[in-house]
Amino acid sequence: HYREVYDLLGADYIIDESNEQRLTSVKRVGDKVSYHNDGIVRWGGAFSQIEYSNGMLSAFFNLSASNSGYKRIDYFKKRDLVLSDTTYREALGTSVTTNLIFDDQGNLVGANKTQVLDTIVHNGVAYTMNSDEAKLAETNWKNIPGFTIKTGANYNLDDKNNVFLNLGYLSKAPRFNNVYDYSNRLYRDIKNESVSALELGYSFRSSVFSSNLNMYYTIWNNKPSNGGITVTIDDIPFRANINGMDALHKGIELDLSCKLLSNLSLEGLLSIGDWRWTSTETVRFYDDDNSIALDPNSGDTIEVSFDADGVRVGDAAQTQLGFSLRYEPTTVSYVKLRYTFFDDYFADFDPISLGGENGGRDSWQIPSYDLIDLHCGYNFKLNQKNKLSLRLSILNLFDKIYISDAQNNDPYNDVSYQDFDAKSASVFFGLGRRFTMSARLNF
C-alpha cells in the first residue's frame, strides 16, 4: 500500500516528509509518498463434510476450521535494531537538525535543515539504519482462529419440485484493518465476528421453465466498523474496535428461466432485502491491567455511545431487479441483452457516528439507477477437434451516468458537512460504456 507521485502539474518537485528513513524530502514522479506498507495474510483451514441421500431426501453436515495470520511491514517507519541481547523498536532512520540563522542585531533571518542518520551505540558499537542489524519495522504474526458449522437438507416433492433448508454458524476473523493500526500496534479488543444464518427455499424444474425462490434470515453479531476508532490509554494512542455492533439481514430472492422458443430464452431475477443495524450501545475500554481506561486530561471514563438501532445497512443495493433475453440466430451464435435495476442503496457510514441527535438516522440514499449490457458470441469449428469461440461485451451500453458508491458525511471532503445528504457525501461514479472481447481455443 502506497501513494505515488505521477503528475507534478507543472512543478519541479513536491516536499514530503512522511518517510522516516528519507535522505531527502524532495519527491519527483515515481517516488512514493504519504505511506508505504504491506499487509501480509497467511490463511490455513480444514474442511469436513458428511452427506446422506436416499433419492427423495438428501442432507449434509459440514464442519470447517481456519486460522488467519496477519503481519504488517512498514517501509516508511524507522528501522528496528535487532541485537542478540535486546531490540530497539523503530529507532534507526533519519532525523532533521535545524540551525537557526541570526543577523548582527540578533534577529532570526533563516534556518538550515540537515538530514542526519540516527545512531545508537550499544556495547561500544555504533549502529545506523544501514547496519545489517537494522531491520524493517514489522509486527509479529497475529493468529486468529475461526470455524464454521453448516447443515442442510433437500426434499424432492416429485420430479419437478423440491424444497430445501440450510442452517449455519460462522465465527469469522476480523479484517486486517481491524487487527493492526498504522503504527504497527495491535488493536484493542480484537474479537471474531459471528454470523448465524437460516435459508429456506423452493425450486421448480421443467423442460421449458425453471425457478428458485429462497428466503434468508441472517444475524451478524460483532461487526466492527472498518478501522475502528482512536483511544488514548496511559498516554499512548491506540486504535480500538467497537465490539457489539450487530446487524440483521433478511430478504427474499427469486430467479427464473423460461425457454420462449427453441432459440429464444428469458431469464429474470429479483432480490428484496431488509438489512438493518440492531445495536444501541455504550462501549468502555480497558487498559492492560483490565482496569477501566480514563481520559488522561479529564479523568473521565473513555467510552463511546451510539444508536444504530433500525438504521439501514449501507454500501450495497438492497433491492435488485433484472432480466435478460438471449437469442440464438444459429446454432453457433447468440446475442444477449441484460437489464439490471438497483434501488434502496444507502451510502456507507460509520455506525458509531450515530450519537446524540443523529441517533437512529439513516445515511444518504444513493439515487436508484439501471444498466443495460449487451453480449454476443460466435463459435468457429476449425476442424473435427478444434473450436474457436469469440465473445464481445458492451457494458453500460447507453453510457449511463450513475453513482456506484458513496461515503456518508465524509470528513475528507474539502468542505465537510454532517447533514446526511448529498452535499455531505463523497461519491464514486460508475464506469461508463466499455468494451471487452475474449477468444477461447478448444483443442
Task: Label the model's feature ranges.
Residues H1, F61-N67, L165-Y169, L213-Y217, ...:
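Transmembrane beta-barrel strands of outer-membrane/channel proteins
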Residues A46-Y52, T151-Y155, L200-F204, M215, ...:
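Residues on the lipid-exposed face of transmembrane beta-strands in outer-membrane beta-barrel proteins
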Residues S53-L57, N67-S68, Y75, Y217-I219, ...:
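Gram-negative outer-membrane beta-barrel transporters
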Residues M56-A59, K160-V163, V208-S211, N263-L266, ...:
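Repeated loop/turn-to-beta-strand initiation elements of outer-membrane beta-barrel proteins
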Residues N221, L266, F341-S353, Y378-F443:
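C-terminal beta-signal and adjacent terminal beta-strands/loops
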Residues G314-Q384, F398, A406-Q407:
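C-terminal beta-barrel architecture of Gram-negative outer-membrane proteins
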